[in-house]
């Protein structure tokens, strides 16, 4: 399994994994990750491992039934945190972020710089054009300089799509 970590900022949070269906789009600029809404069980399971017969009671004393809740699997597994932007603050953030990614590319993959500049400018323009369709997620450390994943729903779909800048991630094999 490969986990993709942020290369910008101080935290280098884990942001996504190839455990989820992912494809490259926009000339290899973006990873599109298919997420799903899943139900997680919030009940506390207490099993001391002693006498199994005595553990099978009708009602566990002292443990409330917490129920379950719906979550997005990528958000839950990668511990992503929803954040918010208005158009102006996102524009400021993305300019600074692109500058950092370009600096990393210039050092590590200079042949990719020109394509990144062109494709990233086109992509950001399209995001700003549909700005209200997106939600924004940071890694668990909420690094303000780090990668912000975009989430949206395709028309008629119930499961969300996450978008990540491929050049802003480092792949780590586990």
Curated annotation (Swiss-Prot):
A Pfam match: TCTP
Q: Where in the cell is it found?
A: Cytoplasm
Top-level taxonomic group: Eukaryota
> Which residues does the UniProt record annotate as the domain TCTP?
1-174
Gene3D superfamilies hit by this protein: Metal Binding Protein, Guanine Nucleotide Exchange Factor, Chain A
Question: Is Transcription among this UniProt entry's keywords?
Answer: no
What is the purpose of this protein? Involved in calcium binding and microtubule stabilization.
Q: Which family does it belong to?
A: Belongs to the TCTP family.
**Name this polypeptide is given:** Translationally-controlled tumor protein homolog 1
Organism of provenance:
Dictyostelium discoideum (Social amoeba)
């Amino acid at each position: 399994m490969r986990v993709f970590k942020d290369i910008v900022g101080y935290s280098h949070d884990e942001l996504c994994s190839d455990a989820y269906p992912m494809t490259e789009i926009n000339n290899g600029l973006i990873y599109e990750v298919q997420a799903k809404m899943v139900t997680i069980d919030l009940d506390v399971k207490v099993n001391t491992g002693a006498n199994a017969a005595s553990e099978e009671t009708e009602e566990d004393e002292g443990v409330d039934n917490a129920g379950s809740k719906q979550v997005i699997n990528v958000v839950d597994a990668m511990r992503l945190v929803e954040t918010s932007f208005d158009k102006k603050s996102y524009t400021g953030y993305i300019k600074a972020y692109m500058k950092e990614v370009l600096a990393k590319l210039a050092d590590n993959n200079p042949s990719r710089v020109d394509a990144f500049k062109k494709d990233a400018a086109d992509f950001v323009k399209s995001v700003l054009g549909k700005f209200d369709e997106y939600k924004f997620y940071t890694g668990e450390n909420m690094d303000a300089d780090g990668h912000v994943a975009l989430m949206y729903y395709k028309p008629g779909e119930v499961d969300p799509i996450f978008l990540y800048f491929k050049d802003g991630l480092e792949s780590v094999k586990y």
